[in-house]
């Protein structure tokens, strides 16, 4: 389904009336397995000569970091909630509907190589930053090592840049120097190449998840979701009660990636005066191994919350159609869900005026939000939206393993119905109409109560009409009618005997004819699915 969604979204973006540059496909190529960049990292700048003492310090740093004993698969792990008790099934009356709420235990396991960036921590995120690979990195609060730095090489993947124009050497890799270098690369492209590539299509990354718990969504989208949800305000309470269905979508439009050279040895990322003892004093050890931000994606990040109070099982399909722009004109149920749903968007980047935007609207307006920022230019500047980290020990990718258990809540609405009786026959008739009403005890077990119409077995002369109103939890409906023939050997004759009928909005039972030739019909208006 996600692949289909990605195709639909791509079609939306390429349908914009913009000139397509010659090499747009190179700029918009996207490798799903490696969000940040698929290009090779730049080569390291030449090492400057070291004094014997500096070489000794460098060798000691290399030996210490390369000797750290840790399992890279267990360093960065997020453990979410553990579910021990699953609440029982329950039902309740809500207006003209009976709602049945069911809960199931579910789990999610997600490996994330990319870490999402939100505005609160963007100042900590820059290519080449040295960080500790520990729980703070998992929590998206990277602990940057405050040490002197050596030079490093940055490269950018904007199209057309030749003759090493896409690379720059930062001699002293501080945060400000690196950010200035990134700005220099972007401005270089704007001045020399932007005219030849007027509309660089953003690379798209799309992911979605129906919402049930905050822990589940953190495992799905990373701990940055905590900050995002301060604005999205996912209504977990209403979701848990079965009164609302909500979906969260992460939609990235990546304009360019900035990559960092892989160091040939760990000490190449440190200034000449840095010692092993300084790193140890800063807490660098096997529990907090050093890592570096190897690549940063710049662009526009949109988080969406889609909301509806529908109990339909087609809500996910309706949301997918709204996001992709797929027509649902032939499906009344999907059309009604979209019409009666809303969205909230939190947007980072893509605007020269506001870095963060919060927008509320109807699903019909959603495509306009996704179309904006589809291309990179001076008017749609990119901000850091995601980054990857590598272990300094061996340049291996540092992957965050997220897992959580959660309760999936589903609800189904059963609409009230009625039986309309019409007796126009030339005889005395008696009816017997019964049904079962289903409820649930505190443990979630079904409680079945048998119900009978108050006019059962009472003689009715033509013309007689009546309506029997049935609640949404009515099941196993039985309709029986007999007529008096006046014959001594067959005083009563069955006219209709229909059993175990489903609940419908309007069931019309008609009987007519004579004592010897009675007739009946059982028809349905607007059946309830």
Curated annotation (Swiss-Prot):
Chain positions of motif Cholesterol binding: 515-516
Example of a GO biological process term: killing of cells of another organism
UniProt KW keywords: Cytolysis, Hemolysis, Host cell membrane, Host membrane, Lipid-binding, Membrane, Secreted, Signal, Toxin, Transmembrane, Transmembrane beta strand, Virulence
Bilayer-spanning residue ranges: 214-227, 234-243, 312-321, 329-341
Regulation: Activity of listeriolysin O is regulated on multiple levels. It should be high in the phagosome, thereby allowing escape of the bacteria from the phagosomal compartment. Then, once inside the host cytosol, the activity must be controlled to prevent lysis of the host plasma membrane and loss of the intracellular environment.
Membrane topology: Multi-pass membrane protein
InterPro entries: Thiol_cytolys_C, Thiol_cytolys_C_sf, Thiol_cytolysin, Thiol_cytolysin_ab_sf, Thiol_cytolysin_sf
Signal peptide: 1-24
Localization, UniProt: Secreted; Host membrane; Host cell membrane
Cellular component, GO annotation: extracellular region; host cell plasma membrane; membrane
Function of the molecule: A cholesterol-dependent toxin that causes cytolysis by forming pores in cholesterol containing host membranes. After binding to target membranes, the protein undergoes a major conformation change, leading to its insertion in the host membrane and formation of an oligomeric pore complex. Cholesterol is required for binding to host membranes, membrane insertion and pore formation; cholesterol binding is mediated by a Thr-Leu pair in the C-terminus. Acts as a major virulence factor required for the escape of bacteria from phagosomal vacuoles and entry into the host cytosol.
Similarity remark: Belongs to the cholesterol-dependent cytolysin family.
Assembly mode: Homooligomeric pore complex of 35 to 50 subunits; when inserted in the host membrane.
Protein name from the UniProt record: Listeriolysin O
